[in-house]
Amino acid sequence: LSLYAVGILLSRASKMPGRDGDILARLTTLPQALADHAKKGILQAQFAQLPPVPQLARHLATLLGSFTFDWSILPESPRKTSLPLQMPLLTLHDANSEALLQQQLQTQWQTTWQQHFATAPWMMRNWLIYRVYHDVIGQTDGADYFPLVCDFYLLRTLISLWTLDGSSLRQEDIFALFAMFERWRASENALLVRQQIQSLCAADPLLSAFSLLT
């Protein structure tokens, strides 16, 4: 919901051309207006009405199998050994198996969130705050919002894959998965993957991003 609110903020800001005093004053009122909508449940209702557009999410889950992660960052565990061997298999999925995998991962994320993040939401929230502050604030066209939401979806998919076979997920594993993903983001492989992801993006980056939040 927090990422959806950021997207709404960017969408409304993009529809306010110019930077005169009146426009800037209206922009400064948007965060409080969104907070008020959240308190009243309006924002949640709008979020629940987002239509599911699973194609992009399915493609991203498959694409994750081609990422060159530095698995050595992870603390020792059986999953550290088994998951890297399973990742390349993601690239072999056809359309039908992509759809099944995406459904499994979505269900698994709900379970994983409740077990590991619901009582400690700061772990994901701190990462999101860092990314929004460094990559999104100051942008009004959604160009940097779409990569952020893609990264959120990829990171949650990676975590869901970790727990998909019933493997335990320690807090140290979570921190290491975040670190491993951030190291990948700074790699040459990430630049190539970004180009592939952009080719999957629809004309409107905000709508593409919203499709990953459903």
Language-model-detected regions and their locations in the chain:
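Hydrophobic, aromatic-lined core segments that form the binding pocket/scaffold
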Residues: S2-T214
